[in-house]
UniProtKB/Swiss-Prot annotation:
It catalyses: L-glutaminyl-[peptide chain release factor] + S-adenosyl-L-methionine = N(5)-methyl-L-glutaminyl-[peptide chain release factor] + S-adenosyl-L-homocysteine + H(+). PANTHER family: HEMK METHYLTRANSFERASE, MTRF1L RELEASE FACTOR GLUTAMINE METHYLTRANSFERASE. The crystal structure corresponding to PDB 1SG9 shows a glutamate anhydride cross-link formed between the Glu-97 side chains from two molecules, but this has not been observed in other PrmC structures from T.maritima. This cross-link is suggested being an artifact of concentration during crystallization. InterPro entries: DNA_methylase_N6_adenine_CS, HemK-like, N5-glutamine_MTase, PrmC_N, RF_methyltr_PrmC, SAM-dependent_MTases_sf, Small_mtfrase_dom. HAMAP family: RF_methyltr_PrmC. Methylates the class 1 translation termination release factors RF1/PrfA and RF2/PrfB on the glutamine residue of the universally conserved GGQ motif. It comes from Thermotoga maritima (strain ATCC 43589 / DSM 3109 / JCM 10099 / NBRC 100826 / MSB8). Belongs to the protein N5-glutamine methyltransferase family. PrmC subfamily. S-adenosyl-L-methionine binds at residues 129-133, 151, 180, 197. This is Release factor glutamine methyltransferase. GO terms for biological process: methylation; translational termination. Monomer and homodimer.
């Protein structure tokens, strides 16, 4: 139960403020009221459910901060950079500018990975381009596997490490800065599964304004979006391993030219979303 006092003195009624702020986000997002509720609850330090308490008020200082953040969101700045966190697989992940925000559809990649881990008794997993650590930390959290994660961004490595500590898996989630699996060359032979949500957006693609605030190296995969896959499969011998990666829905035919013996899987929306290569001997 929230212990904040009801409206009095110079405090403003919270729902008057929420209505005004929601109007500022119309045309920016389809979930303007929800986003304002999340921003307000963040500033006040209470659950958004407690905002429904009758006559709850905000101080002038709190109102000023809320308005600043709403204006920032209205400019296109990503909501989850403002909130400083994003839920993924039922877990709260720290995110900040310079780190890719995990997407809901990537939860399906993690669920597929967990099924394969259970089926084959996999003990060692790699996560390339870990970002916030959403994939790798979730795998470590919901299985007994050890995860070796990499990212080219120092900021991402820092945040991923914090998220591993936050969710109690820092003893099984190890992250280093570098491209592909180069930082863990000495572990490559022992890695049984390789996961990634790589940059696969075409360089010419037109993206929503808020997405453009995210690190371009986590989004764009060259002219046709396939640079990552070409380099990865050209560089590494995946014999004896399982590779599971996210892909663009229109990239299946071109990916077939890059790697053979691959299964392409659809997501819950019926779109091709995952590349699965199983080269285990059993």
């Amino acid at each position: 139960m929230d212990t904040r006092k009801n409206v009095s003195g110079a405090e403003r009624k919270i729902w008057s403020l929420i209505r005004d702020c929601s109007g500022k986000l119309e045309g920016v997002t389809e979930t303007s009221v929800l986003e304002v509720l999340l921003i307000v609850s963040r500033v006040l330090g209470i659950r958004k459910e407690d905002l429904f308490l009758k006559d709850l008020g905000v101080s002038p200082t709190e109102e000023k901060r809320i308005l600043e953040l709403v204006e920032k969101r209205a400019s296109g700045y990503p909501l989850h950079y403002i909130l400083g966190e994003k839920e993924f697989m039922g877990l709260s992940f720290l995110v900040e500018e310079g780190v890719f925000v995990p997407r809901p559809e990537t939860e399906e990649l993690v669920e597929l990975a967990l099924e394969l881990i259970r089926k084959y008794g996999i003990k060692t997993v790699a996560d390339i381009g870990t970002g916030s650590g959403a994939i790798g930390v979730s795998v470590a959290k919901f299985s007994d596997a050890i995860v070796f994660a990499t990212d080219v961004s120092s900021k991402a490595v820092e945040i991923a490490r914090k998220n591993a500590e936050r969710h109690g898996v820092s003893d099984r989630f190890f992250v280093r800065k570098g491209e592909f699996l180069e930082p863990f060359k000495e572990k490559f032979a022992s890695i049984e599964m390789i996961l990634s949500n790589p940059p696969y957006v075409k360089s010419s693609a037109h993206l929503p304004k808020d997405v453009l605030f995210e690190p371009p190296e986590a989004l764009f995969g060259g002219e046709d979006g396939l640079d990552f896959y070409r380099e990865f499969f050209g560089r590494y011998d995946t014999s004896g391993k399982i590779v599971l990666m996210e892909i663009g829905e229109d990239q299946v035919e071109e990916l077939k030219k890059i790697v053979s013996d691959t299964v392409f899987l659809k997501d819950s929306a019926g779109k091709y979303r995952f590349l699965l290569l199983n080269r285990r001997s059993s």
